[in-house]
UniProtKB/Swiss-Prot annotation:
PROSITE patterns: NFYA_HAP2_1 (PS00686), NFYA_HAP2_2 (PS51152)
GO cellular component: CCAAT-binding factor complex
GO molecular function annotations of the record: DNA-binding transcription factor activity; transcription cis-regulatory region binding
Complex formation: Heterotrimeric transcription factor composed of three components, NF-YA, NF-YB and NF-YC. NF-YB and NF-YC must interact and dimerize for NF-YA association and DNA binding.
Ranges of Polar residues composition bias in the record: 46-61, 82-92, 248-257, 263-272
UniProt tissue specificity: Ubiquitous.
Name the record gives this protein: Nuclear transcription factor Y subunit A-1
Portion annotated as DNA-binding: 205-230
Known role: Stimulates the transcription of various genes by recognizing and binding to a CCAAT motif in promoters.
Organism encoding this protein: Arabidopsis thaliana (Mouse-ear cress)
Residue ranges, compositional bias (Basic residues): 211-221
Similarity comment: Belongs to the NFYA/HAP2 subunit family.
């Protein structure tokens, strides 16, 4: 005796709904592994779960009617759909059991899954609200406790940016000859150019010391500002000595003449 085809289709639909019932876990929605996973596409001819949950009687009668009309094609689709759903449900149960036993595995699985934005935040604009308290002391709420320093104490006295060196830095005076000044500037430019070209610069002599400068100022100079030679200095000293002697001689002769004149006047006045 053959069974009615409607009865067989009804049993298949009932088994399908039993497999399709969602599994309820105690974990929240953001810790569930299925969060953010795109649902798989269902083949044509498979009834939806929402209609069966909302009105089970009407959906069940509709499923039976559609299954009886489709025939062998719907039977094949139901078989493949049930096999895939059974495999996915068993895999989810196994994964849930392993995660409950091994917390490190659950954390690794959570990191492997792509981060999906929650649906309630999709489509909303996020704006930055300005801070109402502009001062560092929370709008004057902590003013009664006195002034408080913000920052690490050892770094409070340090400058926070580069400072330029003063232009009037104390340097030792440099004494050079007036005629050598242009040559000194020319050599300085040549040394600066050589430094830019990374050439070897030989050691230069130091500038004149202050004591030597004072000694040079005391030395006798000839015509043109040059230092006088020793012979010229001696000749100049001899000439100066002779001039001094000549001047002293003239002064002494003049004094003697004045004395003789005065004596003559006295003698003439005393005579009868």
């Amino acid at each position: 005796m053959q069974s009615k085809p409607g009865r067989e289709n009804e049993e298949e639909v009932n088994n399908h709904h039993a497999v399709q019932q969602p599994m309820m876990y105690a974990e929240p929605w953001w810790k569930n592994n299925s969060f953010g996973v795109v649902p798989q596409a269902r083949p044509s001819g498979i009834p939806s779960n929402s209609s069966s949950l909302d009105c089970p009687n009407g959906s069940e009668s509709n499923d039976v009617h559609s299954a009886s009309e489709d025939g062998a094609l719907n039977g094949e689709n139901d078989g493949t759909w049930k096999d895939s759903q059974a495999a996915t449900s068993s895999r989810s149960v196994d994964n849930h059991g392993m995660e409950g036993n091994d917390p490190a595995l659950s954390i690794r699985n959570m990191h492997d899954q792509p981060l999906v934005q929650p649906p309630e935040l999709v489509g909303h604009y996020i704006a930055c609200v300005p801070n109402p308290y502009q001062d560092p002391y929370y709008g004057g709420l902590m003013g009664a406790y006195g002034h408080q320093q913000l920052g690490f104490r050892p770094y409070l006295g340090m400058p926070r940016e580069r400072t330029a060196l003063p232009l009037d830095m104390a340097q030792e005076p440099v004494y050079v000859n007036a005629k050598q000044y242009e040559g000194i500037l020319r050599r300085r430019k040549a040394r600066a150019k050589a430094e830019l070209e990374r050439k070897v610069i030989r050691d230069r002599k130091p500038y004149l010391h202050e004591s030597r400068h004072k000694h040079a100022m005391r030395r006798a100079r000839a015509s043109g500002g040059r230092f006088a030679k020793k012979s010229e200095v001696e000749a100049g000293e001899d000439a100066g000595g002779r001039d001094r002697e000549r001047g002293s001689a003239t002064n002494s002769s003049g004094s003697e003449q004045v004395e003789t004149d005065s004596n003559e006047t006295l003698n003439s006045s005393g005579a009868p």
